[in-house]
Amino acid sequence: MDELCTIRAVIGLLVPVEWLAKHHDAVRLLDVRGEVVDGEPRYRAYPERYQAGHLPGAVFVDWRHDFTDRSATVPVTVAGPSEFAAEATRLGIGATTTVVAYDGYRNVLAGRIVWVLRSYGHHAAFVLDGGLGAWTAAGLALEPGRVVPEPAVPPHPVPVRMEGLIDLDGMRRAIDLGAQVVDARKELEYAGGETHARRAGHIPGALNVPHRSLLAEDGTFLEPDQLRARLRAAGVDLDRPIVAYCNGGVSATAVAHAVELAGAPRPTVYDGSWNEWGNRDDTPAEMG
């Protein structure tokens, strides 16, 4: 447990596969496999792939529903404090549980779950660097079937505040205060040539940093100096406050994590993102 405490203290976000191979039985592993596709349904989860083979002891998380507000009109809106605590408890996550999440989708979905955990104050939450691919590439075994977690005892406390996620009103205030807005979607969506909302385009003044541009081919994040170079080349000032958005507040967390890995202060993520902004009549949009 001493080494477990050490990794909590010194690691920022990413857990290397070599460490996890030794300590996977001492953490709560979350398998967040799924995808965002251009077809319908756009948001997909893959429990069947999980059951075919997952990291030993991993619990499946359906990112479309778990840790979300299921009554919200905007898809995958983050759950409120009470619902968050209940979901964490169900998954066996108590106040002191170390969590490591992974997926097979460039760790975008795992990163979203970790962002939510940390935003609600559960800072002992990390992403497996390279995700499922890194584990299998290292020759490490998977196990089939479904792991049913024991609820956490005592239950996870209800958070008293959230930091790192904002709603529509918070986004408007951030813009009024001059925050940098970063659009994590692909260039075609940013320019307005493609949209998954009623309206196309981007939030006026937003800089475009597609989240994939910050990842290596194997799904790992680029090195900090490379991240700084990519972000600055896109016009991002790492010394100023940053708010990131995408379509549903998911890939925006990859950009936000990249900003942190680059050594800058923790950004904020607009939860509703373009799913909300692009479907309203009272929000401005730019094309091109």
Regions found by a protein language model. Give the residues of each.
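Cytosolic catalytic domains that perform sulfur/thiol-centered chemistry
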Residues: 2-288
